[in-house]
């Protein structure tokens, strides 16, 4: 960690991104707090929802604004950890942290309705996110995007939007947007796991370095300009990422693929469990209601 300080505070902690995340968090607490009365049918937000949303924002800053983002430009396994948290773990936390009445307000806008109608359909959301994620990690695409000051943030924003749309059919609480039954939700998550496997397998089982931005000095220096001021880079006597490598490049690459798969399995497994137990609880309540409707002598039996 001490070696990273040579890149400066701005590269390590991204103060502008921190301010942006802090602004979102303040806005959230203002909306669910003093401004809640301005929304129709607004009720008090549970501590669980506040925890979910706050954790999502903190995690997003941790991987995108903290040292993880900088390390991810030097070590591929750190990059994959960043991607896993940002696109697999953060979106469900944010969605679970938004109250129903705020969803109702947001979806009252025609533009939002059109976006959800087009991009949040389960099959479209499923294939768009997993397709974009796999396409992004094709070596030629990855290296090109990583070296572009314009393409990189645009691609990350598109991926994040696609991730939110992928999670929408699973976790939104609005009856009018419940396009999947509980059993279909389980199948949806299993399909997500299957579709993401080829991209992970390509990286895990590769026997040679795939990405020039982690092996070629010129490509790496260009990629580092995304998070380190150009003036700082020119003053440093660094020729490549080797000074921070603690494992061979191929092993680091394979570790990155494994990390992505592990995080994906943990999060998807947790959501599958969440959906299953919610479904089981509803079925038990339904059985109790049906039992209460029976005559007393049949209930005893």
Enumerate the language-model features and the residues they cover.
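Alpha-helical membrane segments of multi-pass proteins
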Residues: 1-301
């Amino acid at each position: 960690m001490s070696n990273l300080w040579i890149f400066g505070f701005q590269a390590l902690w991204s103060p502008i991104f921190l301010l942006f995340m802090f602004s979102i968090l303040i806005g959230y607490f203002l909306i669910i707090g003093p401004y809640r009365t301005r929304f129709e049918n607004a009720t008090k937000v549970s501590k669980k929802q506040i925890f979910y949303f706050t954790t999502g924002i903190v995690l997003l800053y941790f991987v995108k604004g903290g040292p993880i983002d900088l390390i991810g430009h030097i070590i591929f396994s750190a990059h994959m950890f960043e991607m896993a948290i940002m696109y697999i773990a953060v979106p469900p936390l944010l969605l679970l942290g938004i109250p129903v009445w705020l969803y109702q307000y947001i979806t009252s806008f025609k533009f939002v309705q059109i976006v959800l109608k087009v991009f949040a359909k389960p099959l479209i959301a499923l294939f768009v996110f997993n397709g974009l994620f796999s396409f992004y990690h094709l070596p030629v695409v990855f290296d090109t995007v990583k070296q572009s000051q314009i393409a990189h943030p645009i691609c990350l924003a598109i991926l994040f939007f696609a991730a939110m749309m992928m999670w929408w059919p699973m976790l939104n609480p609005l009856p009018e947007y419940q396009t999947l039954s509980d059993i279909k939700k389980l199948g949806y998550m299993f399909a997500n796991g299957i579709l993401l496997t080829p991209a992970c397998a390509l990286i895990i089982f590769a026997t040679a370095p795939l990405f020039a931005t982690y092996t070629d000095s010129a490509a790496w220096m260009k990629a580092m300009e995304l998070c380190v001021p150009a003036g700082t880079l020119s003053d440093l006597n660094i020729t490549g990422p080797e000074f921070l490598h603690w494992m061979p490049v191929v092993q680091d690459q394979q570790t990155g693929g494994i990390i992505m798969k592990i995080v994906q399995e943990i999060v998807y497994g947790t959501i599958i469990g969440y959906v299953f137990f919610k479904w089981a609880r509803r079925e038990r309540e339904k059985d109790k209601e049906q039992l209460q409707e029976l005559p007393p002598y049949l209930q005893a039996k």
